[in-house]
Amino acid sequence: MGPHFTLLLAALANCLCPGRPCIKCDQFVTDALKTFENTYLNDHLPHDIHKNVMRMVNHEVSSFGVVTSAEDSYLGAVDENTLEQATWSFLKDLKRITDSDLKGELFIKELLWMLRHQKDIFNNLARQFQKEVLCPNKCGVMSQTLIWCLKCEKQLHICRKSLDCGERHIEVHRSEDLVLDCLLSWHRASKGLTDYSFYRVWENSSETLIAKGKEPYLTKSMVGPEDAGNYRCVLDTINQGHATVIRYDVTVLPPKHSEENQPPNIITQEEHETPVHVTPQTPPGQEPESELYPELHPELYPELIPTVAQNPEKKMKTRLLILLTLGFVVLVASIIISVLHFRKVSAKLKNASDEVKPTASGSKSDQSLSQQMGLKKASQADFNSDYSGDKSEATEN
């Protein structure tokens, strides 16, 4: 902490200049700076320079919005959106420093760079606001809600320009709808607007109120020649004044040609599916060449013109849908056939097994019966042999 550290503090002090503390109008920034002073600085800087550093930080933040260039004059006010963007960027950089846990000279360098960087960001946002957002109306009177950085107060800023927003030429065909549009791009953002009033302006400069309300559009259906002429739209404010005035010069054209309508020989697609055969009339006293196959002259055939040409993409989607449906039907049918075939094969196998069982039992019974008959015959043969032996013995005696 030698002379080099003192030079860093001097460089930080050179950036100071009293200005409008625009970014400090946000409560989140104020709370973050208090936490930064009471928590972070006590652990990362000596106590003897702690207060001086924090005083310079507060002055540097207060200088946000001071534009040094002569061609850029700062109004000293921003809208809520610009202030939110600047606040988010400042808090993000401040958190990055506290998370880095820097100390001593390196901490002072990083803090100095961050303050200069955030000051440039705020100035760029302020310039962008003044060029693109502040008073975007090219005509009329617009009221914007701005935050004035000197006192951190919200006030209405009046953008006064010419009330006359020009004349619009409108052409409409007879029996069509007439639409008068009185909405401008900045009307939604302006404050203190009330009602739209539409007037019919006559040749003697007198006016007749046609409609009044919150809607910026006037629609008149089935216009005729009597609707041609001059109209006027006036947007009122809560101060009983006018915000915008728009004039309209309406011309009613003849109705569109009948050839643009659907010709009588056009048939629909349903009628095209069932074509009608036209047979030419035969003059009296003259027979057709062939009653079975009459030949018609090409001019006698009706001209078939489709009403609407089919969209190729829609046609392709329809075909794909049909193919998918047919594929699903085939898949379901194949599954059903497979299940039925499996059941049929299972039934056949079951019947075959049932037939094999009685045959095996019958063969076993026949074998046992043959064994019993053999035993019976053997026993009878033994009996006959015994009887013949006894008989021979009796004869000998």
UniProtKB/Swiss-Prot annotation:
Q: Which residues lie on this side of the membrane: Cytoplasmic?
A: 341-397
UniProt topological domain (Extracellular) ranges: 22-319
Effect caused by changing residue 157 to A: Abolishes adhesion to oocytes
Highest taxon of source: Eukaryota
Q: Where is this region: Important for interaction with IZUMO1R?
A: 148-160
Q: Which UniProt keywords apply?
A: Cell membrane, Cytoplasmic vesicle, Disulfide bond, Fertilization, Glycoprotein, Immunoglobulin domain, Membrane, Phosphoprotein, Signal, Transmembrane, Transmembrane helix
> What does the UniProt record tell us about how this protein is modified after translation?
N-glycosylated. Glycosylation is not essential for fusion and for proper protein trafficking in sperm.
- Ranges of biased composition (kind: Basic and acidic residues): 388-397
Instruction: Report the GO molecular function annotations.
Output: protein binding involved in heterotypic cell-cell adhesion; protein homodimerization activity; receptor ligand activity; signaling receptor binding
Name all Ig-like C2-type domain ranges: 167-251
Q: What is the effect of changing residue 158 to R?
A: Strongly decreases adhesion to oocytes
Location comes to: Cell membrane; Cytoplasmic vesicle, Secretory vesicle, Acrosome membrane
Impact of altering residue 88 to A? Answer: No effect on localization to cell membrane or interaction with IZUMO1R but loss of its ability to mediate cell-cell fusion
| Listed InterPro entries | Ig-like_dom_sf (IPR036179), IZUMO (IPR029389), Izumo-Ig (IPR032699), IZUMO1 (IPR032700)
The UniProt disruption phenotype note reads:
Mice are healthy but the males are sterile. They produce morphologically normal sperm that can bind to and penetrate the zona pellucida but that are incapable of fusing with eggs. Spermatozoa show impaired adhesion to the oolemma.
Outcome, altering residue 28 to A:
No effect on localization to cell membrane or interaction with IZUMO1R but loss of its ability to mediate cell-cell fusion
Which residues does the record list as glycosylated?
A: 204
The answer to whether keyword Phosphoprotein applies is yes
> Which residues lie within the region annotated Disordered?
271-292, 351-397
How does the annotation summarize its subunit structure? Answer: Monomer, homodimer; disulfide-linked and homooligomer; depending on the context. Interacts with IZUMO1R/JUNO. IZUMO1 and IZUMO1R/JUNO form a complex with 1:1 stoichiometry. In gamete recognition, IZUMO1R/JUNO first binds to monomeric IZUMO1. The weak, but specific interaction with IZUMO1R/JUNO induces IZUMO1 homodimerization. The process follows a tight binding phase where IZUMO1 bends the entire structure towards the sperm membrane side through a thiol-disulfide exchange reaction. The molecule no longer binds to IZUMO1R/JUNO and instead binds to a putative second oocyte receptor.
Protein family membership? Belongs to the Izumo family.
User: Domain text from the record?
Assistant: The extracellular domain assumes a distinct boomerang shape when not bound to IZUMO1R/JUNO. Interaction with IZUMO1R/JUNO triggers a conformation change, so that the IZUMO1 extracellular domain assumes an upright conformation.
- The name of this protein is Izumo sperm-egg fusion protein 1
Q: Gene name, please? A: Izumo1
